[in-house]
Amino acid sequence: MSNYLDFEKSIKQIDEDIANAKIRGDEHAVEILNKNLSKEISKVYKNLNEYQRLQLARHPDRPYAIDYINSFLVDGYEVHGDRAFRDDPAIVCYIGYIGGKKTVVIGEQKGRGTKNKLKRNFGMPHPEGYRKALRVAKLAEKFNLPILFLIDTPGAYPGVGAEERGQSEAIARNLFEFANLKTPIIAVVIGEGGSGGALAIGVADRLAMMKNSVFSVISPEGCAAILWNDPTKQEQATKSMKITADDLKNLSLIDDVINEPINGAHRDKDGAAKALANYFISELAELEKLDINELVAKRIDKVLSIGAYEE
């Protein structure tokens, strides 16, 4: 792995030692170093703070929506376009099988490498992306297919063109439509859950977060710039904002936390994908026991119960 975070320096050193030992052909040293690596990973990842989890949520090697789709979706094929303006590559929509169950998977895709990041607009959808998601979700409702949302975006794209084409309307429309959609919906934050850009595919019967993901109304850098006029105080902001999976579970804003492999999803993509797929399969089995009208009523009540109010 070529991308290491500042708190992973000790892990990087052992990885380099293992690589050198392999070059020398010293199998005994490799065996010892691998044991040391496992111990060091457990030590480093055992007590991560909020800012370190934010760094992991943004890690360039972290699996994106298409990585998960390629891992556990069988016989999947992609659906394109909103049938009104264009296809938005920042949102991907697939139909395939998870655990033998035909499923619609809709995810936000950031992209890797300069060319692909530009194509995917760094995971920031335009309104046509959200309208594509709604179009495909309506197909899921029509054919009685469950939906899996994979949330991973810094936020909805704030460009002039996006605003002119109704970015806020597209997000609001999705909130309304998904709340009333007559099919089971499970949403999982797999990386960054950035504000309205995440909420637009975040209304679900079950909302979960991968252990090292975040969900917030604004980026910590933006929060620090507003509150302290200093974006470099993002670490302080991250702690204050309560944006980690554990924080949001404690606040009852999400339903579940999906544990990642001990060394993080970026170092064990297959393990992370297996955990996510198993969660979807088990939760879907529970949701399918409910009458569809009861399911929708519970979903609406769930959305309306969010927040603290004083009169």
Swiss-Prot record:
<comment type="subunit">
    <text>Acetyl-CoA carboxylase is a heterohexamer composed of biotin carboxyl carrier protein (AccB), biotin carboxylase (AccC) and two subunits each of ACCase subunit alpha (AccA) and ACCase subunit beta (AccD).</text>
</comment>
<comment type="function">
    <text>Component of the acetyl coenzyme A carboxylase (ACC) complex. First, biotin carboxylase catalyzes the carboxylation of biotin on its carrier protein (BCCP) and then the CO(2) group is transferred by the carboxyltransferase to acetyl-CoA to form malonyl-CoA.</text>
</comment>
<dbReference type="GO" id="GO:0003989">
    <property type="term" value="F:acetyl-CoA carboxylase activity"/>
</dbReference>
<keyword id="KW-0444">Lipid biosynthesis</keyword>
<feature type="domain" description="CoA carboxyltransferase C-terminal">
    <location>
        <begin position="36"/>
        <end position="286"/>
    </location>
</feature>
<keyword id="KW-0963">Cytoplasm</keyword>
<dbReference type="InterPro" id="IPR029045">
    <property type="entry name" value="ClpP/crotonase-like_dom_sf"/>
</dbReference>
<dbReference type="GO" id="GO:0006633">
    <property type="term" value="P:fatty acid biosynthetic process"/>
</dbReference>
<keyword id="KW-0276">Fatty acid metabolism</keyword>
<protein>
    <recommendedName>
        <fullName>Acetyl-coenzyme A carboxylase carboxyl transferase subunit alpha</fullName>
        <ecNumber>2.1.3.15</ecNumber>
    </recommendedName>
</protein>
<keyword id="KW-0275">Fatty acid biosynthesis</keyword>
<dbReference type="GO" id="GO:0009317">
    <property type="term" value="C:acetyl-CoA carboxylase complex"/>
</dbReference>
<dbReference type="InterPro" id="IPR001095">
    <property type="entry name" value="Acetyl_CoA_COase_a_su"/>
</dbReference>
<comment type="pathway">
    <text>Lipid metabolism; malonyl-CoA biosynthesis; malonyl-CoA from acetyl-CoA: step 1/1.</text>
</comment>
<dbReference type="GO" id="GO:2001295">
    <property type="term" value="P:malonyl-CoA biosynthetic process"/>
</dbReference>
<keyword id="KW-0067">ATP-binding</keyword>
<keyword id="KW-0443">Lipid metabolism</keyword>
<dbReference type="GO" id="GO:0016743">
    <property type="term" value="F:carboxyl- or carbamoyltransferase activity"/>
</dbReference>
<comment type="similarity">
    <text>Belongs to the AccA family.</text>
</comment>
<keyword id="KW-0808">Transferase</keyword>
<keyword id="KW-0547">Nucleotide-binding</keyword>
<dbReference type="InterPro" id="IPR011763">
    <property type="entry name" value="COA_CT_C"/>
</dbReference>
<dbReference type="Pfam" id="PF03255">
    <property type="entry name" value="ACCA"/>
</dbReference>
<dbReference type="GO" id="GO:0005524">
    <property type="term" value="F:ATP binding"/>
</dbReference>
